[in-house]
UniProtKB/Swiss-Prot annotation:
Primary residence: cytoplasm
SMART domains: AAA, LON
Name of the coding gene: lon2
Single GO BP term: cellular response to heat
Assigned EC number: 3.4.21.53
Function of the protein: ATP-dependent serine protease that mediates the selective degradation of mutant and abnormal proteins as well as certain short-lived regulatory proteins. Required for cellular homeostasis and for survival from DNA damage and developmental changes induced by stress. Degrades polypeptides processively to yield small peptide fragments that are 5 to 10 amino acids long. Binds to DNA in a double-stranded, site-specific manner.
Recorded superkingdom: Bacteria
Family: Belongs to the peptidase S16 family.
Name this polypeptide is given: Lon protease 2
Enzyme class: hydrolase
UniProt entry keywords in alphabetical sequence: ATP-binding, Cytoplasm, Hydrolase, Nucleotide-binding, Protease, Serine protease, Stress response
GO molecular function: ATP binding; ATP hydrolysis activity; ATP-dependent peptidase activity; sequence-specific DNA binding; serine-type endopeptidase activity
Source organism: Hydrogenovibrio crunogenus (strain DSM 25203 / XCL-2)
Length: 878
């Protein structure tokens, strides 16, 4: 059930419809509040009458007689009050005598009850407060002690609800239950008010309530209609009805309102009502003060706005200031005069400037033209920074920022030397390729510092929208230029160093192919006339130096890769990592933690142990994480006061970093097992190849280890070559005819592919066929052809580093990779023994002992005799 407790709620759609349908008799009963005229003199006259009544005691008797007359009328009206009532439980708030409110009921829940009430001669029903959430399923214990008898006027049963006007008559209390479930019905009695006080006392209470009303009215205009109704219907002497009516207007809790309804002592009830009203006044005052402050702030802001507008208009009339359109046009014209625009850009700018002068500043086209001119005039047309081509200075900057990488530094210095001879450095596209954490991004920044150019970096990894490169067309809402135009604007020069990070991870989608869009940008023959879709004018990028980074070249499209000059950054060896940690990582981490070198020292042996046991990757990113973890562990002890300075030793690492993630790798010299060398995007690695014979009389060959197609083909070539040349390599010529061979590459969870393991697989198969392990610990790499030729492979530097890491000092490489090995720095070649093979015969001589043909034939014949005896025995048995 829903009913409305203030005049503002009467403005809802349902109540308006209900008021329209009310007949003339309802108007005579003063149910509609809107009939009262907003007349200030009426309120003043009522106030004057109240004051006169308080002063002149002679009127008290007359007022008492009026009250007696009113009570007589009430008794007459209530003489037909029923002994039993249908009850409407409500949970919103208690209903008070004297209230007249519209009520809306749920038809499904209360239609039976209302129909029974309508069928009776006088439409009486009881409204009583319940605490149950589901009030139409309330139990007798949920009902309050006291309810209100109401008279129903104009009940209307609609399609989904019932609407009626409820007029509160008097209090009732439940004496006995006739029906404890819906429709609720009970025998009731009607208690009388207890009047423990004189008429003067009650009248004083009435005046106090009226004064409270008068104090509340200026603070909350929502009470104006209720007050007019109040003044027209009640006087100060009618304290009983004043108390109930005043209580119905407060925002007190349901419990306090029900307590008022339960209170029969009139003096006590008036005290409680006054207390509630005083609280209502205090809350309303607080709300009024808050509202006043807010309105004052708003008024001040509005006043300032109007004054600014007036000032602006006055300044326009006096010629002291220009309007927005003129100001924008003058600003852009001033910028254009200072720029060295191309003829095409000048023509386009004049067209857009003409639009600025013609269009209304509020139109969308004006905003588009203004934004375009803003971008155009902020590009560095004809602005170039001076290159610093001092090679000595360049080498110092590179050495300061990076340890090792001498080949990369030399290549950068060569690039600068050519520029010094020409007097300028033309735009170039460099691609730095290497494992994560080897310093590709930092080298790009060092190149910019070396040249004295501005540096701008953005990542193209995961980029799928072509508009990120070449911008959006201006027809789109919120269109913006591409990344290269934004880079030129931020750098404010036309020859910055722009780094495209993670170019090997660029994507494509239905929105376009960013890699194809980069073809124009990264082509020295085309980027002198680069055209962004948003700008729609050509801009010269030929002086810009582009530096791209990638972990691998395999995923870069061929046409894009063809435009780049590739510089490989191989992984660091242990000695290089130690120097990087000592000179760069450790001091930087101490500074970030608020410590210094005197407080925490670390020995080179400790750094080496961290590298070999916890950070064996090609770069130094994970090494930095492990060193930072050590510093954090020690920082706790410094804060707790447990130490003032310390030196980290190898023995401290397991306690602080846990058990080592990596253990020393050992070469396996069992029969059929050979160590190979591999290259991945993470750097070089060793690769163990295992071959085993399954003893059956059936020929077969099986591969495992999650091998790619190319590696499977390499295995097939190795199998075919060894099987056809067993006699040549002094092995059993019929070995593969009677053996099912299984070739496995461990670490099966890691995908593997490539042709460089062909020689290693052939060596493992030959070891199995000869029943002989390789004669010394070594590692090898190379592609094998079907005729036994050893073909060149890539990643020689990474593979050499991987061999040094596991302690292998002897390697077999393809003869055509000799030049790649010779280019390696001396510190990588130191202590290494290299063999270069042109044919697999060279590999076999290095890996197996020389075996005479007679011994091999003797071994073969002995096996043949054993095989013949076994066959004869089987035939005899059968």
């Amino acid at each position: 059930m829903t009913y409305h407790n203030d005049s503002t709620d009467l403005e809802t759609l349902e109540i308006q419809e209900l008021e329209t349908e009310m007949d003339d008799s309802m108007h005579e009963e003063d149910i509609e509040f809107n009939e009262f005229v907003d007349n200030t003199s009426e309120f003043e006259e009522a106030e004057s009458n109240q004051q006169n009544e308080a002063i002149d005691g002679e009127h008290i008797a007359n007022d008492q007689s009026d009250m007696d007359s009113t009570m007589t009328q009430l008794v007459t009206a209530n003489s037909s009050k029923p002994d039993s009532l249908y009850l409407l439980p409500v949970k919103e708030r208690p209903f008070f005598p004297g209230q007249t409110l519209p009520i809306i009921l749920d038809k499904n829940s209360w239609s039976k009850t209302i129909k029974k009430v309508i069928d009776e001669k006088i439409h009486y029903i009881g409204i009583i407060y319940v605490e149950a959430d589901d009030h139409h399923k309330a139990k007798p214990k949920d009902f309050a002690k006291t309810g209100t008898l109401i008279r129903i006027h104009e009940p209307k049963i609609k399609e989904d609800y019932i609407q009626l006007i409820a007029e509160g008559v008097c209090r009732f209390q439940i004496a006995d239950w006739l029906s404890s479930s819906a429709p609720f019905r009970a025998r009731v009695n009607y208690p009388n008010d207890i009047r423990n006080g004189s008429p003067k006392e009650f009248k004083a209470y009435g005046l106090a309530i009226m004064n409270a009303f008068k104090e509340l009215l200026p603070l909350n205009p929502l009470y104006s209609e209720e007050l007019k109704y109040f003044l027209n219907r009640y006087s100060a002497s009618d304290s009983q009805h004043l108390a109930d009516f005043a209580a119905s207007l407060t925002a007190a809790s349901n419990e306090k309102l029900q307590d008022l309804l339960d209170t029969l002592d009139l003096s006590e009830r008036l005290e409680k009502v006054l207390s509630l009203f005083k609280h209502e006044i205090e809350v309303t005052k607080l709300q009024f003060n808050i509202r006043e402050r807010v309105e004052e702030n708003l008024s001040q802001q509005q006043r300032e706005f109007f004054l600014h507008q007036q000032l602006k208009e006055i300044q326009k009339e006096l010629g002291m200031v220009k309007d927005d359109r003129t100001a924008d046009a003058d600003l852009f014209q001033e910028r254009l005069d200072k720029l060295e625009l191309s003829e095409e850009a000048t023509k386009k700018a004049e067209e857009e400037l003409g639009k600025i002068n013609m269009l209304d500043p509020q139109s969308p086209e004006y905003g588009v033209a203004r934004n375009w001119l803003d971008w155009l005039t902020q590009l560095p047309w004809g602005k170039y920074s001076d290159d610093k081509l001092d090679l000595g200075r360049a080498r110092k900057i590179l050495n300061k920022g990076h340890d090792g990488l001498d080949d990369v530094k030399d290549r950068i210095l060569e690039f600068l030397a050519v520029g010094a001879l020409k007097g300028e450095i033309s735009g170039s596209i460099i691609c730095l390729v290497g494992p994560p954490g080897v310093g590709k991004t930092s080298i790009g920044r060092s190149i910019a510092d070396t040249l004295g150019r501005k540096f701008y970096r953005f990542s193209v990894g995961g980029m799928r929208d072509e508009a990120e490169i070449k911008g959006h067309r201006r027809t789109y809402i919120g269109a913006m230029p591409g990344k290269f135009v934004q880079a030129l604007k931020d750098c404010e020069t036309a020859n910055p160093v722009i780094m495209l990070d993670e170019i090997d991870k660029i994507g494509s989608s239905y929105q376009g192919d960013p890699a194809s869009a980069l073809l124009e940008v990264l082509d020295p023959e085309q980027n002198s006339e680069f055209m962004d879709h948003y700008m729609d004018v050509r801009f010269d990028l030929s002086k810009t130096l582009f530096v791209c980074t990638a972990n691998t070249l395999d995923s870069i499209p061929g046409p894009l890769l063809d435009r780049m000059e590739v510089i490989r950054l191989s992984g660091y060896i242990t000695e290089e990592k130690i120097q990087i940690a000592k000179h760069h990582l450790w001091p930087s981490l101490l500074e970030d933690a608020g410590l210094n070198k005197k407080q925490i020292q670390i020995t080179p042996a400790t750094i080496r142990h961290v590298i070999e046991g916890y950070a064996r990757e090609a770069g130094v990113r994970n090494l930095k994480k492990q060193l930072a973890k050590l510093i954090r562990k020690l920082a706790i002890k410094f804060v707790n006061g447990d130490m003032e300075q310390t030196t980290l030793h190898v023995n401290d690492l397991e306690e602080m970093l846990g058990q080592p993630r990596f253990t020393p790798e050992k070469t396996n010299q069992q029969m059929g097992t050979v160590t190979g060398l591999a290259w991945t995007s993470m750097g070089g690695a060793t690769l163990t190849i295992e071959a085993s014979r399954v003893h059956t009389l059936n020929r077969g060959f099986k591969l495992s280890g999650q091998l790619g197609d190319v590696m499977q083909e390499s295995a097939s070539i190795a199998y075919s070559y060894i099987a056809s040349n067993l006699d040549k390599y002094k092995a059993d010529p019929e070995f593969f005819d009677k053996a099912f061979v299984h070739l496995h590459v461990p670490d099966g969870a890691t995908p593997k592919d490539g042709p460089s393991a062909g020689v290693t697989m052939a060596t493992a198969l030959l070891s199995l066929a000869r029943n002989e392990a390789i004669k010394k610990p070594l590692a090898m790499t190379g592609e094998l052809s079907l005729t036994g030729q050893v073909l060149p492979v890539g990643g020689i530097r990474e593979k050499v580093i991987a061999a040094r890491r596991v302690g292998i000092k002897e390697l077999i490489l393809p003869d055509e990779n000799r030049k790649d090995y010779d280019e390696l720095p001396d510190y990588l070649k130191e202590g290494m023994t290299l063999h270069f093979a042109k044919h697999f015969d060279d590999v076999a001589k290095l890996t197996f002992h020389i075996r005479s043909k007679s011994s091999a034939l003797k071994k073969y014949l002995s096996k043949a005799v054993i095989s013949t005896e076994e066959k004869t025995e089987q035939e005899t048995t059968s």
